[in-house]
């Protein structure tokens, strides 16, 4: 896609449980990206990253795309799309090949990556990414850039990400029904890491947590490479539900209260401050302490980060 000035444009879609986001960027002659359009629409057709109502999903995608097109003054035909959700699986793999010409080439790297995929995975899952963690040449570990190095045997430790075939196809179908060609599907937390993590952080070791509506997606880097990914089935919608239950207020109002007033620790709020909470039905609204709201939110996030900590502990890193 291109604009009237001849510059190339690209578009991306974040199809989440709570909202759909569309982003349009222009690539200038220096290969730099400049955001020129943005669209967002509430999502009601997904649950924990999986399409449960394709018509609602199509409508939300279409509205987000049209809004982005209007702001960017362009027509969007192709998109990069993120994927996440409870259907995502990940595990480690290992491949070994003989170096063909005595010096590692791209063909050798492609071959060892393919060899690492030679394992049994469930028939309802498809390999989305094979992410190299480490290369080994004739027993020498820790090789990051093997091309051009001499040796006889090349090994690769990789991290493999798979997605549900049906979940992926339903997301693709939703976009295609909006007249969009899907250029590439990418794991959400991997895409997020490109935006927010520096090379130093990846080298030293970092865990990125992308908290969505239905799930929280994590990716762990060490030594500059991805070493683990995980999807936690807890997200912002769970906080909204907790608020609705604890304060006895409708879910829509609970979401607004979360956005306007929520805090993740009760120590940060004024104990004297009150907020108005709508009641269920025709009952009059009530005044409650902001500290009470904070305690509800804090409990859920403490649970989330305890689960994340446990999962990291299981990763053997």
Indicate where each model-derived feature is located:
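A structural feature that tracks compact, well-ordered secondary-structure segments
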Residues: 217-219
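ATP-binding/phosphotransfer module of carbohydrate and carboxylate kinases, centering on a glycine-rich
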Residues: 306-317
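Nucleotide/phosphate-binding catalytic cleft detector across ATP-hydrolyzing
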Residues: 1-19, 23-208, 225-227, 236, ...
């Amino acid at each position: 896609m291109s604009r009237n000035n001849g510059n190339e444009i690209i578009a991306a879609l974040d199809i989440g449980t709570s909202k759909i986001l569309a982003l349009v960027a222009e690539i200038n002659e220096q290969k730099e990206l400049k955001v020129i359009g943005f669209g967002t629409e509430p999502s009601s057709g997904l649950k924990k990253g999986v399409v449960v109502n394709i018509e609602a999903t199509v409508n939300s995608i279409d509205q987000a795309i049209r809004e982005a097109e209007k702001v960017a003054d362009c027509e969007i035909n192709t998109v990069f799309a993120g994927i996440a959700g409870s259907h995502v699986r990940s595990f480690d793999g290992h491949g070994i090949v003989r170096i063909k010409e005595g010096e590692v080439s791209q063909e050798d790297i492609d071959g060892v990556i393919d060899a690492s995929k030679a394992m049994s995975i469930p028939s309802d899952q498809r390999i989305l990414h094979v992410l190299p963690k480490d290369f080994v040449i004739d027993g020498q570990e820790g090789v990051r850039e093997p091309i051009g190095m001499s040796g006889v045997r090349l090994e690769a430790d990789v991290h493999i990400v798979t997605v549900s075939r049906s979940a992926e196809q339903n997301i693709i179908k939703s976009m295609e029904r909006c007249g969009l060609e899907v250029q590439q599907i990418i794991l959400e937390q991997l895409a997020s890491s490109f935006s927010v993590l520096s090379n130093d952080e990846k080298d030293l070791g970092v865990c990125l947590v992308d908290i969505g509506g239905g799930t929280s997606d994590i990716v762990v880097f060490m030594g500059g490479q991805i070493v683990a990914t995980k999807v936690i089935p807890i997200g912002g919608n769970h906080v909204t539900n907790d608020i609705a239950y604890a304060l006895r207020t409708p879910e829509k109002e609970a979401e607004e209260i979360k956005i306007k007033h929520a805090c993740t620790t009760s120590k940060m709020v004024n104990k004297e401050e009150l907020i108005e909470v709508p009641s269920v039905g025709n009952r009059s609204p009530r005044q409650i302490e902001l500290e009470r709201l904070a305690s509800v939110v804090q409990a859920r996030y403490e649970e989330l980060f305890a689960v994340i900590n446990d999962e990291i502990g299981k990763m053997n890193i």
